[in-house]
Amino acid sequence: MAGHSKWATTKHKKAANDAKRGKEFAKLIKNIEVAARTGGGDPAANPTLDDMIKKAKKASVPNDNIERARKRGSGEEAGGADWETVMYEGYGPNGVAMLIECLTDNRNRAATDVRTAMTKNGGNLGESGSVAYMFSRTGLVMVEKGELSEDDILIAVLEAGAEEVNDNGEKFEITCAPGDVPAVREALVAADIEVDDTDTDFRASVEVPLQADDARKIFRLIDALEDSDDVQNVYTNMDLSEEVLAELGED
């Protein structure tokens, strides 16, 4: 997969269609609430909250919903849930390792939803630690290329903890330790470079190459998992060639 973004394949994003729009809104709102609770309700002093609000606005979440979530998280308004992050591990069809990240206020419900989706779509839930050792957590910062060069990005972020700068076509992807994401973001802002997105990803040390039909099975399983309101992200170790990606793009 040289030259192609793992962002698009190891972390499958929901299609932005009307049927899934409401669920995506709910997940973005949940992230705002958690960010405000963890780091305070002032976006200027809480880079994570600022990023979450920008993501929600980019997805056209109404401003009223964003503001209420921020206030619930910071304690300015009552009604915030007791969210916790839970990771589930397992295998999909063809031995593809999967990490399922949930943000939930009910562990039993989340576990049931994940187990049901896995069982019905050719996967199986594993014990804690069964696949996590194959993945390492990585911080990601995305920048629109525009007129920028790779050197422009490197000069701005090298002292802030950046590890690599990858050219993904329309964007540069900067990788770093998860804890260095705020510093990399701030270094870019200081250099008058606009940050498009920040995130954390789980990258696999060993990947499983798949043909298009097998990849479709994994994506069906991911869609079933993401039908649960508790599931935030799904990470896999599948490896898709440019040819397979092109074939999937025709679906």
Swiss-Prot record:
GO terms for biological process: regulation of DNA-templated transcription. It holds the Pfam family Transcrip_reg. Its main location: cytoplasm. GO terms for molecular function: DNA binding. GO terms for cellular component: cytosol. It is found in: Cytoplasm. Transmembrane segments: none annotated. Keywords: Cytoplasm, DNA-binding, Transcription, Transcription regulation. The keyword Plastid does not apply. The keyword Kinase does not apply. Residues 1-21 are annotated as: Disordered. Belongs to the TACO1 family. PANTHER family: TRANSCRIPTIONAL REGULATORY PROTEIN YEBC-RELATED, TRANSLATIONAL ACTIVATOR OF CYTOCHROME C OXIDASE 1. This is Probable transcriptional regulatory protein cauri_1421.
